[in-house]
Structure formats: structure tokens, C-alpha cells
A protein has these predicted regions:
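Mid-to-C-terminal secondary-structure elements
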Residues: 124-148, 156-303, 379-383, 466, ...
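Short, strongly hydrophobic transmembrane alpha-helices
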Residues: 19-46, 50, 319-320, 363-367, ...
Length: 850
């Protein structure tokens, strides 16, 4: 122990006496370890972290896919359930202590605290079964949790609020428990606050603000409630395994229950059964561990995190190579000192241990600095990844596993890249080292040093090429033709109370909104729609074309659709390329009409004019419902990375009266619009207050969720790609800088070692230009070898990322050419100063020194 302390004190003295070396080494390590730890922090928080609940390993989800919100016939792997089906499955699973159900897609509701809120707030609420909090083993931070007695239609309406919302929206009001809130205009009693750190069973960027009992959904959603007869599939289910029980046999028992239910008891329309029944034997249930909750962000960000992990791992390798080169150069510079100590009787093992201690100390100090870089870096990454989100339920603070990872990484770095320099330094022969201590004719950089510089150049090219590909892909995404205009367009997300308007009242409300907004001085036109392009929403439906029979119940036959007002297409800038748009003649008393996009026209009406043709939703019974009057230009509504889906549009002013209960319910629900679109003129920066006031004057109960420009709405779709591209670009620049530092150090060291040789050359007639060429040739030879190795590696890395690239090849010559030029320019900048110093050598002084 005493010897170890002596070695540590000696290492600290050595580092203190070489501040430039120490600072460079620590900065290099801090960047490499910090960036890698930051990515590991986010990976652990998003991909690996368990829910903050009791014994999460005992939780299992029934089903393992993520559906949108309702229905669920598209997948054989069944994951979405109606309330009666959930009850049937729960009863057939005795291995579970209890099974809870919860809403797959929590919605936005108008929520106001009695006597304290002047205006309602647009907050997200999730319906849960009465045993939800009990299954997760959670108590309330204040008050009590929702229980089974609350989950009754006859019970008094209650709600729980999240700890985050209680703090941020209600100022941690200690008297909030027991107060009255109005949800969609209905009074409820707030009975409790959820524990800190619990954001629901799904890790998402918009977690619930409130939780409501499942069976009270009918109170708030009225005629649109999912709990009414003809139940749709809209719930997820999670069960808690009994101690000692196993889930292995459970899927085989639950699958027949599901199939019997779908065949005999599911309240699907009779005319739909002939198409559905043949697919029932293919339906099955799978159970998956649910300790991490329902995967949402895991699915969304998994690929990006893997790319960033590879990028940071590469950056760490470059940083380690730089550190090893610094240690090798430092060991070579101390050859004479090492020789003296060996001549005086110092043991080689002691010298190795001392230099290894110095490397380990550097690594530990660099790791501590890296934790600071990791904390800041993780916060920066969260800000970039969730730029459009108001809240992110992910902690940027490194957890204990992350701290252990950083510590282990630091030690590993010190051992791997400290052993070789220490061993090489200890091999010095005292007589040889002392004889050449003052000579300037040493051979120069060693082979390991050259290999490290070549490795840095190769890996830097890989990072630069990857960053270039990701940046070019992002540019292609943002500059593509979306099929609509974003300039001077504004979107407003609204939430009209579902049970407050009859269809007649809705028509009057919509006319008042359009007329009131158009009267504003900076508004040229206004329209309404169920949802606007690239807003994260999608309505899907099967369609049947007149004369072609029933559609099959597969996703491939599904299309998207929207319900829009007459001015919609001109307001958003989506052109009608054939036929006409909606007009005054398309009223509630005229024949139902539709406009289809080019993709739907190509798919269902190839080689014929779709205008004048008829189609309907769901099945052939309704195939003559809508007459196509126009074809709209293809536009991207769902995924900007994919081609436009087939899509049709229905006029907001028309309704169809269906004999089928489910179809009629959908018809009513889709008349509640969620989006207003505006075409503005002039400066729109100060328009939001005017818009809010105008809408409040029309209907004070109309909840406004967001007001943003169309360009902002579109840009929010690329937050993840932007984060990856910006971080990869930053890491690529850092890698190039580290490679330049390594090349500069090696070139300067080589020049210092060859001072006498340079003096001899100049004495024999070599001019300064020849000396500069000599030095640059040696430096560029190393870089050229690095490029030869790095180009195939970069091509391979591009192929690994191909799925993340948009309209760019994984070996794009422009990107690769720019990366090579950038690395070459950096190498030239790193080599020119040592070359200039070599050319400025005084031959007499150099020879006299020798």
C-alpha cells in the first residue's frame, strides 16, 4: 500500500510538471468517456430502465404490439382489447394476481379547477381500471389511489393528478386533494396525487396528466364513449404474476379464449363477419415482460440510439488512440530520465508500475471530468431529441449503473492504453539511452505511434462520412416536396367538448370559426379538418369500390382519410389536379361526395378516370356511398420518410346516416374536428393572441391545444433525425480535431528527433521548400494510409445506417469526397507548423547540438 501511495504521489508530481500534456490528455479522455457515457445514460433510461413500481419483474403484458387507439383487426398478434374481452381474458389467467386494463391512446381533455382556473387547460387524461395502481404496487403521494369501488358507472366521478402536473400546472397546491375539477364540463373530485417519478405505464414524451376510472368514460365522452355497446378494441392489459407461478402455458390458454370471443361474442357488424371469420384461427396472444412498461420511445428511438452508441464508441477509440500516442511520446521524451534510473538500479517492474499508475490516474481524472461532460451532453441530447415536447419523462442524471459503466470504462482505458507505452519505456538500455540522450538523430516516431495516427485518420473519416450522410439525409427530408405549402400557414389544434354539441350546433360553430378568423386583418383564408398534414394523426379505413366486392381485412387494403371544410385545399396549398374541389353545392342535403389523392386513384382506378366513380367505407354494402368529384395532389400526411398513402377526403358539411351502429358512431365522432388551418398574410409573429381571443369570443369552452406555424409542425417530425445528425456532426468534428492533434504531435516529435538530419540536409544544399516537402510527405503518407483503410470502413458504416437514410446512397460520392477533403485540410493545418519549424532550422546550431 505504501508503494502504491508513493507511485500515486509521483504520478501527480509528473502530471503537475507537464500541464500542457496533462490538460490535453484529460480533455481528450473527458470528451471520449463523456460522450459515450451520455449516450449510455439515455440508452439505459429509454431502453433498459424498469418502471418505478413494486417488483417490476413480475409484470407481464398480454400482447406485444402497439396499435394506434381503437379496433385492431389488422394484426394476428392480438394486443388491443375491448372491455368485455379484457374481463374474459383476466378471468382465464389464474397465474396473475390481478390484471389491469388501461387506455391505449390517452386523449386531450378540457380540464378546469373549480374557482381557481378562469380557463380550461388542455391536459392529457388516461382511463384505467380500478385495480391499475394496485397491480403496479403504487400508493398515492397525497390522498389515495383509484380503486375498484371508483371504477363503477354509478360511483361518484373521481380523478388522480400526476405529481409533475400538480407541481408545474398547479404550483404544488397542498389543498388540491379533495377539490373539484371539471373534465369536459363534468365535475369530478380529485382524490390523490401519483408518486414522484411515475409517468404512467408507457414511456412517452406526452405522459398523462390525469387518470380517470375506466367505467366513467361514458360520462366524459358521451355518445362517443368506447364503453357503450358494440365495444371497440381500445385497451391494453398488464397482469402481475403470482409468486411461484409461470406464464409459459398462459398464451396457449388465452389464444382459444380470444378466438372463441371473436367468433361467437364480439359485436362486429353481421355483414363484416364473412370476411373476418376465416382469419380468426390465425389470431393469437403472446405474453411479454412488462417491467419496462409498454414500449413507445424504445421503438421510436432504438435505432437512433444504436447509431449514436456506435458513433460515440468510435470517438472513444480515437480519444484512446490519442491518449496512447501522447503517452508514447511522453515516454520517448523521458528515455534519458528512464535510463538514468535504470543505471542507478531501479527495477523495470517498478518503472512499468509507475508509468501505468500515471496512465490510470489520468484515466480516472478523465473519467470524473467525463461525468460532467456526460451530464451536460445527455441534457443537450434530450433537448435536441424532444425539441417540440413540453416535457420529457427521462432523467439526464447518470444512474448508479451508468456511474459504474463510466468508472469501468475509465479503468479499461487506462489499462489498455497505458500498458504498451509503459512497457516500451522500460525497455530502454541505459548505455544506449545515455549515449543518445543529447543527440538529435533518433529515428523519429515509432511504429506504434504511426499505427495510432493511421487509426485515428481512418476512424475520423468513418465519423465524418457518417455525419455527412446523416446531415444530407436530414436536408433531403426537410427540403422534399410534401405536396402542400408551409409558407405563411398556421395550424391550431383544438379540442371541442364531444358531448356539448349536436350536429346542427357543430355546423354553426364551424361557420362561426371560419368567418370569425377570416375577419382578422392578417388572415387570408381559414379551414377546418379532422387533422392537418404531418400532425402525428391518422384515420384509417377499409374501402370498397362499387362493383368490386368486399375488401379484405388486411392493412394493405387500408387507406387514410380526413374530413375537411370547403376552403381546406386552397388554405393548405394542396392542389386539385383533376375534377373539382368541394363547393357550396356539397351540402348536407346533396349526394355525398369525396376527393381522392393520386395514390388512391392509381391503386384503385388504374388506367381509368376516377372522377364519377363510387366507393364506400368498410364493405360492399356501402360501396355506392361517395361519388368521387376530384383528385388532389399526393401529399404526405403520416410519415415524411415514406411515399404518400392512398387517401380520401370528405366534406365537413356532409353526413351519412348508416344503419350500422359502429359506422354511425364513427360518422358522428369524425365530425368533431381537431385542427384549424390558416393562410396568413404579412407578419404572423403577433397573430397568436388575436387568434386565441377570436376563438374565445366564439366559444369559451373551446380548448386550444397548440398554435404553431405549419413549418414548425413539419419540422417537429424531424427532431430525432436532427438530433442524430447534429450530434454525429459534432462528434465527427471532435474526431477530426483529435486526429489533427495526434498528427501534429507526431510530426512535431519527428521533426525534433531528426533535427541533426535536417541540419545536414540543409548544409548539403537542401532549401526550405525541400524540407517542408520532406515533413509534409511523411505526415500525408500516414493520412493517406488512414484514408485507404477508412474508405471501406465508412462504406460499411453507411450500409449499416442505410435504413436511416432518406434519398441518399450509403456511399454518396459527394459526402465521401467532402469528408476526405476536410480530413486532408485538417492534416495540412496540423502538419504545416512543424514543417515550418523544420524549414527554419539553423544548420550550424543543429550540427553543433549533435
Amino acid at each position: 500500500m505504501q508503494t502504491l501511495l508513493q507511485d500515486i504521489r509521483y504520478a501527480l508530481r509528473q502530471l503537475r510538471h507537464a500541464p500542457t500534456f496533462t490538460l490535453t490528455a484529460l480533455l481528450t479522455l473527458a470528451i471520449g468517456i463523456g460522450a459515450t457515457t451520455a449516450i449510455f445514460t439515455l440508452t439505459q433510461a429509454i431502453m433498459l430502465k424498469s418502471l418505478p413500481v413494486a417488483d417490476p419483474a413480475q409484470l407481464y403484458r398480454i400482447g406485444d404490439t402497439e396499435e394506434c387507439c381503437v379496433e385492431g383487426w389488422e394484426d394476428d398478434d392480438w394486443s388491443l382489447f375491448s372491455y368485455p374481452l379484457y374481463q374474459r381474458l383476466a378471468a382465464a389467467a389464474p397465474e396473475f394476481e390481478e390484471t389491469t386494463a388501461f387506455q391505449a391512446a390517452p386523449g386531450i381533455y378540457s380540464i378546469r379547477q373549480e374557482a381557481k382556473d378562469r380557463e380550461a387547460r388542455p391536459l392529457r387524461a388516461e382511463y384505467v381500471s380500478g385495480n391499475y395502481f394496485h397491480v403496479f404496487g403504487l400508493g398515492a403521494f397525497a390522498g389515495r389511489v383509484i380503486n375498484k369501488s371508483d371504477d363503477q358507472q354509478s360511483a361518484s366521478p373521481v380523478a388522480m393528478i400526476s405529481y409533475r402536473t400538480w407541481q408545474q400546472a398547479y404550483g404544488s397546491d397542498p389543498g388540491i386533494v379533495g377539490s373539484t375539477f371539471f373534465v369536459q364540463g363534468q365535475p369530478v373530485t380529485l382524490i390523490g396525487i401519483t408518486p414522484p417519478g411515475f409517468f404512467g405505464e408507457t414511456l412517452r414524451s406526452d405522459p398523462p396528466d390525469f387518470w380517470l376510472p375506466l367505467q366513467q368514460e361514458i360520462l366524459f365522452d358521451g355518445q362517443n364513449a368506447h364503453m357503450r355497446p358494440n365495444h371497440p378494441q381500445w385497451l391494453y392489459a398488464i397482469g402481475r404474476l403470482k409468486p411461484g407461478a409461470s406464464v409459459h402455458a398462459l398464451p396457449a390458454r388465452l389464444t382459444p379464449v380470444l378466438q372463441r370471443w371473436l367468433r361467437d361474442e364480439d359485436e362486429m357488424p353481421a355483414e363484416f363477419k364473412p370476411q373476418v371469420e376465416p382469419t380468426i384461427p390465425q389470431k393469437f396472444i403472446r405474453l411479454v415482460p412488462a417491467g419496462g412498461g409498454v414500449t413507445s420511445l424504445r421503438e421510436d428511438y432504438g435505432a437512433s440510439l444504436r447509431i449514436l452508441l456506435m458513433v460515440c464508441g468510435t470517438l472513444l477509440l480515437i480519444a484512446c488512440a490519442n491518449l496512447a500516442n501522447l503517452l508514447l511520446a511522453r515516454g520517448a521524451a523521458r528515455r534519458a530520465q528512464t535510463a538514468v534510473r535504470l543505471a542507478l538500479g531501479a527495477a523495470r517492474t517498478r518503472l512499468i508500475r509507475q508509468q501505468l499508475t500515471e496512465a490510470m490516474l489520468l484515466s480516472v481524472l478523465g473519467g470524473l471530468a467525463g461525468l460532467g461532460v456526460a451530464y451536460v451532453g445527455a441534457r443537450l441530447m434530450l433537448a435536441l431529441a424532444f425539441h417540440s415536447a413540453t416535457f420529457t419523462p427521462i432523467s439526464a442524471t447518470p444512474s448508479l449503473p451508468v456511474l459504474g459503466f463510466a468508472f469501468a470504462l475509465s479503468l479499461l482505458t487506462g489499462v489498455l492504453f497505458g500498458v504498451v507505452p509503459a512497457w516500451l519505456a522500460s525497455r530502454s538500455e541505459p548505455a544506449e539511452a545515455l549515449h543518445g540522450a543529447g543527440r538529435g538523430t533518433r529515428a523519429g516516431a515509432s511504429l506504434p505511434q504511426k499505427i495510432l495516427v493511421v487509426s485515428q485518420a481512418a476512424l475520423s473519416l468513418v465519423l465524418l462520412a457518417c455525419a455527412g450522410l446523416l446531415t444530407a439525409s436530414l436536408r433531403n427530408l426537410e427540403s422534399q416536396d410534401f405536396g402542400f405549402d408551409v409558407q405563411n400557414r398556421i395550424t391550431i389544434q383544438i379540442n371541442p367538448p364531444l358531448d356539448s354539441y349536436t350536429p346542427e350546433h357543430l355546423d354553426a360553430l364551424y361557420r362561426a370559426i371560419e368567418d370569425g378568423l377570416v375577419r382578422l386583418p392578417n388572415v387570408q383564408s381559414a379551414s377546418l379538418a379532422g387533422y392537418s398534414p404531418l400532425s402525428g394523426n391518422n384515420w384509417g379505413e377499409l374501402i370498397a369500390v362499387e362493383g368490386r366486392g368486399d375488401p379484405t381485412a388486411t392493412q394493405a387494403e387500408g387507406v387514410s382519410w380526413d374530413r375537411v371544410s370547403r376552403q381546406y385545399f386552397s388554405t393548405v396549398g394542396q392542389r386539385i389536379v383533376r375534377g373539382r374541389g368541394f363547393g357550396e353545392s356539397d351540402s348536407g342535403t346533396s349526394r355525398p361526395v369525396a376527393i381522392v389523392n393520386e395514390s388512391l386513384a392509381r391503386k384503385y382506378f388504374p388506367n381509368e378516370d376516377p372522377v364519377g366513380k363510387h366507393f364506400g367505407m368498410d364493405n360492399s354494402r356501402y360501396a355506392a356511398t361517395f361519388e368521387i368529384v376530384g383528385v388532389a395532389r399526393d401529399a404526405k400526411y403520416n410519415d415524411p420518410n415514406q411515399p404518400p398513402r392512398p387517401m380520401f377526403f370528405l366534406p365537413l358539411e356532409q353526413s351519412v346516416h348508416y344503419p350500422d351502429v359502429l359506422m354511425q358512431r364513427s360518422e358522428i365522432q369524425t365530425h368533431f374536428v381537431g385542427s384549424i388551418q390558416l393562410l396568413a398574410r404579412g407578419d404572423t409573429r403577433n397573430l397568436e393572441p388575436q387568434l386565441r381571443k377570436a376563438l374565445a369570443d366564439i366559444d369559451p369552452n373551446l380548448t386550444i391545444i397548440t398554435v404553431q406555424s405549419m413549418s414548425e409542425q413539419v419540422a417537429s417530425n424531424f427532431d430525432q433525425q436532427r438530433m442524430v445528425a447534429q450530434l454525429a456532426g459534432t462528434f465527427g468534428f471532435i474526431a477530426m480535431l483529435l486526429a489533427a492533434i495526434g498528427l501534429y504531435g507526431l510530426t512535431a516529435y519527428t521533426v525534433a528527433c531528426r533535427t541533426s538530419e535536417i541540419g545536414v540536409r540543409m548544409a548539403l544544399g537542401a532549401d526550405r521548400l525541400n524540407i517542408v516537402r520532406l515533413v509534409l510527405r511523411g505526415a500525408f503518407l500516414l493520412v493517406a494510409v488512414g484514408l485507404l483503410i477508412g474508405i471501406p470502413l465508412a462504406i460499411g458504416a453507411g450500409r449499416l445506417m442505410a435504413a436511416q437514410l432518406f434519398e441518399i446512397r450509403s456511399w454518396d460520392p459527394h459526402v465521401f469526397g467532402f469528408s476526405i477533403l476536410a480530413l486532408g485540410a485538417c492534416a495540412a493545418a496540423a502538419s504545416i507548423l512543424p514543417a515550418h519549424q523544420a524549414a527554419s532550422t539553423d544548420p550550424l546550431k543543429a550540427l553543433r547540438t549533435d
